[in-house]
Each structure stands twice: as C-alpha cells, then as structure tokens.
Regions:
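Ser/Thr-rich, Proline-interspersed low-complexity disordered segments
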Residues: 1-21
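A eukaryote-biased signal for short, well-structured alpha-helical docking elements
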Residues: 16-32, 123-164, 267
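Low-complexity, acidic Ser/Thr/Pro/Gly-rich terminal tails and inter-domain linkers that flank the onset
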Residues: 24-51, 151-182
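Short, solvent-exposed loop/turn segments enriched in Ser/Thr/Gly
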Residues: 51-58, 182-189
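Short, solvent-exposed, Trp/other aromatic-anchored flexible loops in extracytoplasmic proteins
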Residues: 54, 81-136, 212-262
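Asparagine-centered strand-capping/turn motif at beta-strand->loop junctions
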Residues: 60-66, 191-197
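Hydrophobic beta-strand positions in extracellular immunoglobulin-like domains
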Residues: 61, 75-76, 103, 192, ...
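Short, hydrophobic/aromatic beta-strand segments
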Residues: 67-74, 198-206
C-alpha cells in the first residue's frame, strides 16, 4: 500500500478543501518529505494550482551519492484515474535539482476530475548507468487540497451511450463512444477498471476494421485498484489503404495481463466486436 509522506510545516494545514484562486500555493508553508536517507532526499516544496493551466508540484531531488541517478514517477494516478505526467530527472552525483511535475487541467477534466484531491505515485530512483540497480521504489499518496483517505472520492463517469465489453471480478472495459467525424482518423474512447490488487496491462490483439486487419498499437497500464481513460486511434491513411470510408465494425481480442509478471496467465483473453 502507498505511504503517506511526512510533512514539515511552520503553519498548520487546513482541514477543509482549499478553493483555488487563479494561482496559489496549496501547501502554504508546508514541505512534504517523501524520502530522506543516506543516498537521496526528495521533498515536495510547494504545490501551485492554476485554474487555467492546472496543478504544478515543485519537487527537490538531492543525490547524496557519487554517481548519477535517475529520479522518476511511475504508476501515477489522480483521484483514482491513471495519469502520466511524463516526469523524470537525472541528477549528477552530489548535486540537487529543483523540478516541476505538471498536471494538465484539460486532460484531468476529460476524466471527470475537477479537483485534484488525491495523487498516488511510485517514486523510482535508479543508477543512470545501470538501470537494473534500484536505490528506491516506493509508493506514496498525497492530498493537495487538504482532504484525507476517508474524505476524497473517485469521480464517477456518466456515459449513457457506452458499450460494456467486459465486466468481471477482475476487470471492466467499456467503449464509451467513437468519433468518426474527423476524416483523418477514427478514434474510440475507452474506460477501464482494475479491480485486483495487482498492476495490470490492457492491450488489443488481432484487430480488424470492417474485416481488414489494422493494428492501432494500443496498450495501457492500470495500477492496482485504479481506473483509466484512453483513446484508441485508427488513422485515415490506414483506413483509406483498405478502402474503408465508414467504420461499421471493429473486432479485437482484449488481453489483460499482470504488468509485473509477464509469464503469468492472462486474466482476460476474449474477442469482441464493436459497432459504432
């Protein structure tokens, strides 16, 4: 389970959610300590929320070793939904970097998230020259708006036209809608739930459109107990090459596997047909 980090403060944090102004530091005078050991120290120095651009987490990473290290976030979720901020920093031996993790307002709103009440992530620190050597791999949960584990809620999705393709004790996979208005591509918007205590990988195999094999090269990882929204795109050039002017059916084999154990059996391996 994720660790709740330590806080260092000169002013008491509020118990109630912070209502963001155009831009403000949600931590006030608080510094969140994620890790502090002989090798590394990582602190969240402040969290700024801008109503137009999104949330920015200012992070300080200190490398106390004599070799270059790579700091990164993995398996990131915001309010229960997977979100990849694409953050990583390489820090030379004995040096410190001040960096920023950005959470985009538009991307979060597409998932139904209007307030970033909870963020869970795995902090990885590895040797830059030897990626097999891990100095740190630990999960953390922070609550930027002052809520806690008992008060924040996962935003629920309302998609009346959605087609539920798979729903069992382990996974849920839903095609919410498809957009064929843009002649340059055909995009399917999908939603997934991981109901297990393992990290899972969702992918499509043996995909055909109107009976013609076209591979969208799609795969998404979903952390244990989390949800995800994603887009699956077929490009106009591929459709045109197969003489497809309008998509009438998409057939695919949905594969759900253990993200951390590639030799494990599939949790799901089933073929479905979607009719837009």
């Amino acid at each position: 389970s994720a660790t709740t980090p330590t806080t260092e403060m000169t002013g008491a944090p509020t118990d109630a959610p912070t209502q963001p102004t155009e831009s403000q530091n949600l931590l006030d005078d608080t510094i969140i300590e994620l890790v502090n050991n002989d090798d590394v120290a990582v602190h969240i120095m402040n969290i700024e929320n801008n109503e137009h651009t999104g949330m920015q987490l200012r992070i300080q990473c200190e490398n106390r070793t004599d070799r270059a290290l790579m700091f990164s976030w993995d398996m990131v979720s915001v309010c229960g939904y997977m979100y990849d901020p694409m953050w990583a920093e390489e820090v030379a031996g004995g040096k410190t970097v001040n960096s920023t993790v950005y959470l985009d307002t538009y991307a979060l709103e597409q998932m139904g998230i209007t307030s970033v009440d909870e963020i869970t992530f795995t902090l990885n620190v590895i040797d830059s020259e030897n990626w097999m050597e891990t100095l740190l791999k630990e999960s953390f949960t922070i609550y930027p708006t002052g809520l806690d584990a008992s008060t924040w809620q996962v935003p629920q999705r309302e998609t009346p036209d959605a087609q539920v393709m798979a729903d069992d004790e382990n996974v849920r996979f839903v095609i919410e809608w498809a957009d064929g208005e843009d002649t340059s591509k055909f995009t399917m918007y999908v939603y997934m739930e991981n109901k297990t205590d393992r990290n899972l990988m969702y992918s499509w195999d043996m995909v055909s459109v109107n009976g013609y094999m076209i591979d969208p090269f799609w795969a998404v990882s979903v952390a244990a107990g989390k949800r995800a929204c994603s887009e699956i795109t077929f490009y106009g050039s591929d459709l045109e090459a197969n003489g497809i002017e309008e998509v009438s059916d998409v057939e695919f084999t949905l594969l759900v596997s253990d993200y951390d154990d590639w030799e494990a059996d599939y949790l799901l391996e089933e073929t479905y047909t979607y009719n837009p």
